[in-house]
């Protein structure tokens, strides 16, 4: 499989992001490993939005190339893969996706995921890089197939970061 462009940031607030290349297999391997954090799922649920952001921010990535290493809308030259945020996934969504998705994909749970309230990230590689103008349309088409109401609006932002997988201590 071809090399995919990816930009890494040490945190969501990083000013400079490192452009790199990865293979699909290497990206999938990286996403299999979660960082265990100290708090329990119940403690995480009780945190403020700011506290939650700090706990789960162990760095992240953008699925494409960033001009000058800046994660600004106008600096995204192209995207190599689709990154979707299913924060309102229905129970059974994960099993259905794994069973029915006909494309190469990786799905991983978010820090706030629970069996009763599934929250997942879905990553799909493109056969070739796509332009920023095409990205939102492709993302909206894909989410419409799976139930657009289950996906957060950030899924359509060309410069949206995805956090690396993190999990509460008892998650």
Predicted regions located by residue number:
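Low-complexity, flexible helical/coil segments
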Residues: 118-121, 142
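Generic beta-strand structural signal
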Residues: 103, 120, 160-162
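Hydrophobic, well-ordered secondary-structure segments
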Residues: 135-139, 143, 161
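A common structural junction motif
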Residues: 101-106, 140-150
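Short, conserved secondary-structure transition motifs
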Residues: 115, 125-130, 151-171
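Signature for HUH/AEP ssDNA processing cores
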Residues: 1-118, 125-137
């Amino acid at each position: 499989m071809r090399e995919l462009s990816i930009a890494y940031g040490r945190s969501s607030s990083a000013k400079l992001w490192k452009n790199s290349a990865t293979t699909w297999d290497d990206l999938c391997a990286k996403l299999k490993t979660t960082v265990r954090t100290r708090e329990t799922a119940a403690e995480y649920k009780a945190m403020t939005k700011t506290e939650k952001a700090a706990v789960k921010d162990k760095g992240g990535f953008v699925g494409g190339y960033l001009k000058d290493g800046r994660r600004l809308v106008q600096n995204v030259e192209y995207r190599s893969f689709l990154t979707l945020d299913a924060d309102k996934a229905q129970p059974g969504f994960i099993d259905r996706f794994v069973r029915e998705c006909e494309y190469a994909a990786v799905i991983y749970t978010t820090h706030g995921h629970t069996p009763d309230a599934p929250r997942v990230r879905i990553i799909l590689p493109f056969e070739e890089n796509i332009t920023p103008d095409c990205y939102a349309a492709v993302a909206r088409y894909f989410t419409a197939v799976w139930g657009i109401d289950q996906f957060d609006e950030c899924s359509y932002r060309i410069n949206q970061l995805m956090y690396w997988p993190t999990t509460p201590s008892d998650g």
